[in-house]
């Protein structure tokens, strides 16, 4: 798929990321349509995926996404919790439309409901859990890209990207690689420069574990410093209240005394 170009070939750093995230580990069961992507079978029954074919299908999916003129017409879907954060991050960096969580039945086929949408392309995390949007897409001729495991059904799927879609780290890494490849094909980022967005942002985080980590981080923080109270010298002040009270008592007139009556008449009578 790379056409012999070294710039499009799978790099050693990307291979290391895939191996660490267990992207190459499939399940014990194999769908007959997924046999072409299986490299070999381990002694414990786990099937190993061919990462070279995974990379080729990833590039094909990225080219299909870039071919859509309006990115908002591309819907990225994940019903499983481990892929919801990755879907939201992918939509943020590629300007696509995310559906994280439960898919509303009839969103692609029932025109009278408020949630009706007409996407041009779907990208789903797991064909097993996201079977409802895949089925509705087949009714209205919407192409579908899916991350598939060795036991995933490929019915109504146009581009299958073989990977371990049951691991939180693996599915987060695959969404990150797909987002990076889309941005490279659009010309947003260069292939010679490392994408500054770390892959950890696409990984699923359990809310309970996140709360525990925050609580542990707070315990490691040093206790706040309490400043000691400083006694400031108090200047001696004169009690002005006594002097004011003395002057007031001496200067008050007796308003109860009889006033001198003045006669306004000429004879001095009232």
Curated annotation (Swiss-Prot):
Statement: the UniProt record of this protein carries the keyword Nucleus: yes
Keywords per UniProt: Cytoplasm, Developmental protein, Nucleus, Ribonucleoprotein, Ribosomal protein
UniProt family annotation: Belongs to the universal ribosomal protein uS2 family.
Record note on quaternary structure: Component of the small ribosomal subunit. Mature ribosomes consist of a small (40S) and a large (60S) subunit. The 40S subunit contains about 33 different proteins and 1 molecule of RNA (18S). The 60S subunit contains about 49 different proteins and 3 molecules of RNA (28S, 5.8S and 5S). Interacts with oho23B/rpS21.
Pfam family, one: Ribosomal_S2
Chain positions covered by the region annotation Disordered: 251-270
GO cellular component: cytosolic ribosome; cytosolic small ribosomal subunit; nucleus; ribosome
Gene3D superfamilies linked to this entry: Glucose-6-phosphate isomerase like protein, domain 1 (3.40.50.10490)
Biased composition (Polar residues): 261-270
Origin species: Drosophila melanogaster
One of the GO BP terms on file: ribosomal small subunit assembly
CDD domains reported for this sequence: RPS2 (cd01425)
Leader sequence residues: none
Name this protein carries in UniProt: Small ribosomal subunit protein uS2
